[in-house]
């Protein structure tokens, strides 16, 4: 949930420690120190913990600088070397870095968007590593009962039923290409009615639970999906831009390393499914678990740390 994009906070000065930590056994070169940063909301903190802990478990000295503010504060900190690694979102970051789309524009394809993003990052001496399957973008959900009674698993499954269903979402949804307008143009879905609510917030959740709407727009990594047992419908015709999660790293750090940092961070992305991310978000946001504990448990479950 890129809610951090809309929150503003002052960024304190970050002291960069340049000295390398001790080498590993066997006479290999010393490992560079690493500073992992994040914007200011719980999903980012958990992702920052995942990156930090897998590096720490492999002998890296890591400084955590989380909750630094919105992207327009944190991205410059990454460029300038105040932090080295930042969890990011492909399509959103590409649109932020290349606002005019002169270098590349986000697409619905993860690989294409990654390629375009890398071209945009080259000037800032940054590298985007492998993206996870997990996303944080517009999603459409139904209750478990609705999904079960109508055998709904993907958005295209709504085709026989949409004419008798009510769609809920933000007031601008009917005219937005990634909301009702897109559902009509890409999926051929026309709903019986539309109920203006919020952007996947408590109004939408309550309307789904109260059967005031049949389909609701909720961000794909929102903790309510797990907490309320909603079914996130697969975007099988790729309506949404590819806002997959991926670590962005300073080239200067990668050049000091022997490839281990890249390999370790890519191993996190390879295991991070939508369901896994949503479960961690629910634990941290709803159950109020410590993101450090949640991240450690997930890394151990995936066999990435001992």
Residue ranges of predicted features:
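C-terminal motif of bacterial Sec signal peptides marking the signal peptidase cleavage site
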Residues: 15-20
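Short helices/loops that flank or line small-molecule/ion binding pockets
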Residues: 49, 53-54, 72-84, 99, ...
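Ligand-binding "clamshell"
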Residues: 97-107, 114-129, 212, 224-238
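Bilobed "Venus flytrap"/periplasmic-binding protein-like clamshell domains
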Residues: 33-68, 133-205, 289-293
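Beta->alpha turn/N-cap motifs
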Residues: 70-71, 81-94, 112-113, 143, ...
């Amino acid at each position: 949930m890129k809610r951090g994009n809309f929150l503003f906070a002052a960024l304190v000065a970050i002291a960069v420690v340049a000295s390398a930590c001790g080498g590993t056994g066997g006479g290999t070169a010393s490992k560079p120190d690493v500073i992992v940063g994040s914007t200011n909301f719980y999903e980012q903190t958990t992702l920052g913990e995942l990156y930090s802990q897998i590096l720490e478990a492999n002998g890296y000295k890591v400084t955590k600088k989380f909750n630094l503010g919105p992207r327009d504060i944190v991205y410059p900190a990454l460029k300038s070397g105040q932090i080295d690694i930042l969890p990011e979102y492909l399509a959103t970051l590409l649109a932020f870095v290349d606002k005019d789309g002169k270098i590349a524009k986000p697409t619905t394809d993860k690989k294409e968007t990654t390629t375009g993003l890398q071209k945009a990052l080259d000037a800032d001496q940054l590298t985007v590593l492998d993206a996870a399957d997990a996303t944080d973008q517009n999603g459409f959900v139904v209750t478990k009962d609705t999904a079960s009674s109508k055998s709904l698993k993907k958005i295209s499954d709504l085709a026989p039923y949409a004419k008798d269903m009510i769609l809920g979402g933000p007031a601008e949804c009917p005219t937005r290409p990634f909301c009702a307008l897109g559902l009509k143009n890409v999926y051929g879905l026309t709903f019986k009615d539309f109920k203006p609510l919020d952007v996947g917030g408590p109004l939408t959740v309550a309307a789904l639970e109260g059967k005031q709407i049949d389909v609701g727009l909720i961000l794909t990594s929102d903790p309510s999906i797990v907490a309320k047992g909603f079914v996130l419908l697969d975007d099988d015709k790729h309506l949404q831009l590819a806002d997959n999660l991926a670590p962005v790293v300073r080239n200067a750090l990668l050049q000091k390393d022997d490839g281990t940092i890249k390999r370790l961070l890519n191993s996190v992305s390879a295991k991070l499914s939508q369901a896994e991310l949503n479960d961690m978000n629910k634990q941290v946001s709803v159950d109020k678990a410590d993101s450090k504990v949640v991240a450690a448990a997930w890394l151990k479950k995936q066999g990435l740390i001992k």
